[in-house]
């Protein structure tokens, strides 16, 4: 029997009475929060064996792994409180490699990991080229960025606990919006040209790509930025651009994917929100993947890239990761690169770990370096 997570919740009264031979969860990150109804429903099912399939076992924090392992092997990682003390805090906040090693020793025997780069598993997948695209801010972006940092610095001086975490996460979101485009940050539907270094560079690269007859996926974590990109790219190149986001009905979503993947006259550009389009789609007709803004969990980004870099792809895939030089985007990227072994070991967390940094460390990350502004 095949069921969605929504139907599992609805029909749990019937399904939990069945002595299943096995229960297999696809996209198992859907049970990352043990308090949700769908997570509790999955844990209730009785089966001789359980399997969880996921490309992002740690989507937001290492705590996600506890919920999945608790479904597979109850008690293996202790209670939530024990896990937090033994692994979550040392890994998430302190980036302790010894804690990562201990967690691997416990979970490793129960994990089968397939890498697309392993030629023993997939022999005919073409190469993937990843490159960082460094962009500068316009003067307008620089002024807005400085204003957000000043506001955050004052707020952090007095904020504590949950309020402080809220300030940090809100500031991260605001600064990333500024780096994307002032119109996104201001939300004023203002003109787009000549105001964003990122957008200008994207247009240049898309122009070259279209001239070569290539197709591209463009990922953003912000639905409003997706709308901005769609409008600007359609106006600039005079051709339809698809945009898939969380508000697109399933039927329309299927039509968009089918058009892009199978129709010769379909649009060459497909914008997708990271959450709505980052998993479960086969879009191998694209051979370019643009990450317009970065999600600070490598596994989530890789999942999105794999919409194009997967079995069935016949061309080399070029992955372009946009960063604004001299801003928090570059600094966080540098931190992740320095701790790549830990990030790869337990799949780097999202942005929640940044809330654990000291105020001095946050000021250093938020600060705008001189090289950020265009000459």
For each of these PLM feature ranges, what is it?
Residues 1-95, 104-375:
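ASCE P-loop NTPase motor core, strongest for the SF2 helicase catalytic module
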